[in-house]
Amino acid sequence: MPVAVIDGQPLHYIDQGTGPVVLLGSSYLWDRGMWAPQIEALSQQYRVIVPELWGHGESGQLPANTRSLDDLARQHLALLDHLDIPRVNLVGLSVGGMWGARLALLAPERINSLVMMDTYLGAEPQATREYYFSLFKMIEDAGAIPEPLLDVIAPIFFRPEIDRESALYQDFRTSLQAFSREGLLDSVVPLGRLIFSRPDILDQLSRLDCDTTLVMCGEQDKPRPPAESEEMAKLIGCALTLIPDAGHISSRENPDFVNEALLTFLANHA
């Protein structure tokens, strides 16, 4: 994988295909594999770039000066500068949508179009924030994601009726076990706290271009329920697409639907 040094740390990314650039922003706890079906489909017509989050996949640890989602947005702008890419079509899922929207607000001249999937620009509700922080404390104390937590954390990302013996579920569960102690303590846990203590920026959404923005959400997304996406789409004045038979990682649970929706949107805006 190619690498760019951003804020003193190696940021690894996929760069596949040619054409207008599509930048894919990943979910917390997932590497580039969460976009595998989209990379294959989109790279036939587009140049697809998929950076891996700090502490995830092959990327280095969270840079010391990373204190907010605005910093993540700035770091991804630095990646675009490194690659001499003036404008992108940005597709961000979960935290990828959180920093993606901030990038669009920070540098609107760099954005052709923006797709926010299974994400929310409001603050994390207090109950879920406290719950996630309690999980981070357990992970921190153990220096690993303990076995009992694997089947607490993994289901958060999928629709309720997912087959827990499926390759999709089991591969993700295995990937959670693979995080190193160093990676968890230096990057994954601090990044999680940063994500779930984010400030509310819903009042800024009206600044996004409604004609070149799309909000998408899995119909069965538990951590980011469709009501949040409906709220954001109304504030922006943009289209909303609900993804059937999908939870949080809709890109993997209903890839054909997601691919078709993205290709249709990009054909009109890229």
Descriptions of predicted regions:
Residues 208-209, 215-217:
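Short beta-strand/loop motif that positions the catalytic acidic residue
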Residues 9-62:
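Conserved HGGG/HGGXW glycine-rich cap/lid loop of the alpha/beta-hydrolase fold
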Residues 40, 49-92, 260:
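Active-site loop/oxyanion-hole signature of alpha/beta-hydrolase fold enzymes
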Residues 222-228:
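Conserved alpha/beta-hydrolase "acid-adjacent" motif
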Residues 237-270:
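Catalytic active-site module of serine/aspartate enzymes centered on a nucleophile-bearing elbow/loop
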Residues 92, 96, 100:
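Gly/Ala-rich beta-loop-alpha elbow adjacent to hydrolase catalytic centers
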Residues 125-130, 145-207:
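Conserved alpha/beta-hydrolase catalytic His-Asp/Glu region
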Residues 105, 112-143:
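Flexible "cap/lid" loop of the alpha/beta hydrolase fold
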